[in-house]
Amino acid sequence: MNNFASNDPLVIAGTVYSSRLLTGTGKFKDLDETRLATEAAGSQIVTVAIRRVNIGQDPHQPNLLNVLSPDRYAILPNTAGCYTAEDAVRTCRLARELLDGHRLTKLEVLGDKKTLYPDVVQTLKAAEQLVAEDFQVMVYTSDDPILAKRLEEIGCVAVMPLAAPIGSGLGVQNRYNLLEIIENAQVPIIVDAGVGTASDAAIAMELGCDAVLMNTAIAGARDPVLMASAMRKAVEAGREAFLAGRIPRKRYAAASSPVEGLVG
């Protein structure tokens, strides 16, 4: 942990993290590449699709936990692939059993297979049920400020609005909505989905997001390990720029050199 990270930690559900880059574990060519990219990203929280990745469900298949140990990483099970609140809740219960009572979970309930936008009605329903069952819910949602606040009020420990559709690589498409969500939030706001390259991650952090979660942008790159390293630096730079405070935008030039005492 560097000095800057130790003085500016990310806190989720009372747990302190020095890294603000969360990474997924899907789409890599093999578990070794997953491990190398995760290490290069410097991530402390890694998300796992319970319906797609083996963490003990199948004893005859390679187990992700053998390369990404829960002793080193916070394993964040997610409900990717769920289209109803009932399926999502059932998946979270399975994850808790597989991870020995693990409470932190990433909720996502999708609306359709084309856009992979969240079904906000089903998301709210599932969030209420999971919070009632004492899960610590980090929730994937749209960039609707009203919905984001409602999810916070339900008891979600982090709200994760999309920057753009999952896997699209389009970057932040609606800065205004993200700013509204950030300014009104009392829990961490983590951009989830849509990042394509390092500048996208930096922009999200410059806006004031607390962290960024990504998978495809790293796993789908020509060199996933190198891209993971780039994303790590982008998130750190974006956070520092946010804290430093950018200069205001102006229509006209403003000289950077003093005009007093000019010769001639």
UniProtKB/Swiss-Prot annotation:
| InterPro entries, alphabetized | Aldolase_TIM, Thiazole_synthase_ThiG, ThiG
Q: Name one GO molecular function term.
A: thiazole synthase activity
User: What is catalyzed by this enzyme?
Assistant: [ThiS sulfur-carrier protein]-C-terminal-Gly-aminoethanethioate + 2-iminoacetate + 1-deoxy-D-xylulose 5-phosphate = [ThiS sulfur-carrier protein]-C-terminal Gly-Gly + 2-[(2R,5Z)-2-carboxy-4-methylthiazol-5(2H)-ylidene]ethyl phosphate + 2 H2O + H(+)
Which Pfam families does the UniProt entry name for this protein?
Answer: ThiG (PF05690)
| Functional pathway | Cofactor biosynthesis; thiamine diphosphate biosynthesis
- State the UniProt keywords alphabetically: Cytoplasm, Schiff base, Thiamine biosynthesis, Transferase
Compartments it resides in: Cytoplasm
- Kindly list the positions annotated as binding 1-deoxy-D-xylulose 5-phosphate: 167, 193-194, 215-216
Biological processes per GO annotation: thiamine diphosphate biosynthetic process
Give GO cellular component annotations, separated by semicolons. Answer: cytoplasm
Specify the enzyme's EC class, one word. transferase
Positions of the catalytic residues:
106 (schiff-base intermediate with dxp)
Q: What is its EC number?
A: 2.8.1.10
Q: Which HAMAP family match?
A: ThiG
Q: Which family does it belong to?
A: Belongs to the ThiG family.
Primary role: Catalyzes the rearrangement of 1-deoxy-D-xylulose 5-phosphate (DXP) to produce the thiazole phosphate moiety of thiamine. Sulfur is provided by the thiocarboxylate moiety of the carrier protein ThiS. In vitro, sulfur can be provided by H(2)S.
Give the matching PANTHER family.
THIAZOLE SYNTHASE
What is its quaternary makeup?
Answer: Homotetramer. Forms heterodimers with either ThiH or ThiS.
What protein am I looking at? Thiazole synthase
Q: Which species is this UniProt entry from? A: Xylella fastidiosa (strain Temecula1 / ATCC 700964)
